[in-house]
Amino acid sequence: SWVGIGNAIIGSLIPFFLIGRRARLMSNHIDARTMPDFFGKRFDSSALKTASALIVFVFLIPYTASVYNGLSRLFGMVFDLGENGATIIIILMAVLSALYVTLGGYKATALNDFVQGIIMLIGIGTVVALTVQKKNGFSAAVDSLKSMTEDGKLGSLFGPDPINLLGVVILTSLGTWGLPQMVQKFYAIKDEQAIKKGAIISTLFAIVVAGGSYFMGGFVRLYCTLDPADTSDKAFIETGANGKPVFDTMVPALLHQALPNLLIGLVVVLVLSASLSTLSSLVLTSSSTLTNDLIRPRVKNFDDKKQMLVMRIFIAVFLLISVIIACNKNASISTLMSYSWGALSGAFLGPFLYGLFLKKASPAACWVSFFTGVGITIIHMMLFSLNISAFSGVVQTVNDMGCPLNLLSPINAGAFTMILSLILVPIVSSFTKAPDDKKVEDAFSSLNVK
């Protein structure tokens, strides 16, 4: 539940009040509707705009793949599908996403956001209540968790591993600040009152949905086991081809045991609705960013027909690569999402935040953040997640260090890139040249900042 609380407070409430007004006023004043466009105009650099557009397109792909992966696990559980069946579900969802975005566009995405929000609020409360009730109530469920280990830490306030829990909170809460959707979200806000309403609604929604989801996940050990000799009614979690337990199947297994068939159907609708909203948003963000920020400035007579054609091509490419990655069952949902957010927010968080508050923020500092965010992500992925035999010695050495912070975790790597971005940008900006004074003053004039 701490992750859900962090998502609500750090990921929803604080951004609205801390950067909502500034992001809205500045992005509208300089007419920046996307994150790459913001970097290009705020820092007077077309190269930054191009680089950030490419980063957005490339690293939204694993995020999209993680959504497909989750859907395939859930549908596989509900309909008892094998590996081939799960792959078919991924492909069908990709086709559905493409049709939905192409035919419906932004209006369909917005309408679906509203409808799926209502479904999620109702559904998550029901699912959480039944998950706990199945184990004789909250107190009995917590006591059962405590009894599973000698120290009882599974039922403690901060869980068995609070240090690595902090990494999850940072990645999923602070990480949202640097995602490319942030500029679009605040650009579209009409006035100051809308900021207050948005802060309240999004925070309450995050507490219920994110808090409820993580709260439910805390009881997964009562429904699943990794021990093949366990004779209880717990679901056995098999080992994947990479030798690691397939953790992505745990929550579907929990739902299968805790819920009646009717409510499992509700969960399918719930997740499908939420996933369709997320997928359509990601596809639109990626394809429109690359089209408007990379292609449009370089092509003459780029009319609406050409723009739509190019966007559809990018949508097809984006979804195709996402499906290929999602079909690789060795890539877990958390790993895909961690590397995506680690690269995106690790690259963009510092430049975006300081671009709103610090007049001396420099293009060079942005480049440093881009290179470190993307570079650390790629290096960590190659060393610890791709199972490259040449790096097995490095993995063993890190394992033998006995560090309480899991250095092999892509979640912690992503959290590290975000914190590093916040540290590096002001340091590098202190000894590198800021953009032209007139352009900086013009950008900040909308904020009445002297």
Regions found by a protein language model. Give the residues of each.
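Membrane-embedded helix-loop-helix hairpins and adjacent transmembrane boundary segments
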Residues: 1-450
